[in-house]
Amino acid sequence: MKTSVKFETIFPLTTAPLIQCITNEITCESMANALLYIDAKPIMADDPREFPQMFQQTSALVLNLGHLSQEREQSLLAASDYARQVNKLTVVDLVGYGASDIRNEVGEKLVHNQPTVVKGNLSEMRTFCQLVSHGRGVDGSPLDQSEEAIEELIQALRQQTQKFPQTVFLATGIQDVLVSQEQVIVLQNGVPELDCFTGTGDLVGALVAALLGEGNAPMTAAVAAVSYFNLCGEKAKTKSQGLADFRQNTLNQLSLLMKEKDWFEAVKGRVL
């Protein structure tokens, strides 16, 4: 794929960026370990009383809507407001957007603060763009992944960039769609098994934040994070005998794939 992304300079990370994650209990440990596997550093700090000092130390922030509660809502919104005040690099992950009105309201408030990257699966991002969506809970639907549906979403996300010109929008699925005010990229790596263990989208959000914290441009960080994770899944599939084995091998590949000099040559996609 011809793109301005210089994949060969992405890894290894050289600054050990400290990434603050306000996320859910289900995948909290997996996110923290994924960051460690790529030589970033996690801190799972969600108490607003700590934010002034935390924000002085961290390189980027992840705000994840998964497992929403009143207390977590307060933390997410407080962190989002503070991040905007201090121009903190921020990834907003719209987990389960469309599942409830409360979740939608919180998500809209987070996006209103102009985060660096906004992500979700194709169904979540269709709901965000007020398109018909067939997603259920936190899962995307195959009905939202046809070529026609993806093209419709691309056009809707282009409209969103008019309201949020500094934000890169990422929609993940059978194809991964990335839209900024300047360009549209569609990525085509990955394997179906990545939908069969929980938290894959959360891990991608953490990887995006790490690459932002390392100093990469937003589109570069998003493209590289998605591509790297999907290629880890592809490599893991060749070594696995079941889904639990596949999950472990995917996580293993986060620290291993980057050691292959030309790993990025397997990236597939197109620039529109």
UniProtKB/Swiss-Prot annotation:
The gene is thiM. The keyword Iron-sulfur does not apply. ATP binds at K119, T172. It catalyses: 5-(2-hydroxyethyl)-4-methylthiazole + ATP = 4-methyl-5-(2-phosphooxyethyl)-thiazole + ADP + H(+). Keywords: ATP-binding, Kinase, Magnesium, Metal-binding, Nucleotide-binding, Thiamine biosynthesis, Transferase. Substrate binds at M44, G199. One of its GO terms (molecular function) is magnesium ion binding. Pathway: Cofactor biosynthesis; thiamine diphosphate biosynthesis; 4-methyl-5-(2-phosphoethyl)-thiazole from 5-(2-hydroxyethyl)-4-methylthiazole: step 1/1. Pfam families: HK (PF02110). Belongs to the Thz kinase family. Catalyzes the phosphorylation of the hydroxyl group of 4-methyl-5-beta-hydroxyethylthiazole (THZ). This is Hydroxyethylthiazole kinase. The lineage of its organism: Bacteria, Bacillati, Bacillota, Bacilli, Lactobacillales. Its cofactor is Mg(2+). The keyword Magnesium applies. Its EC number is 2.7.1.50. GO terms for biological process: thiamine biosynthetic process; thiamine diphosphate biosynthetic process.
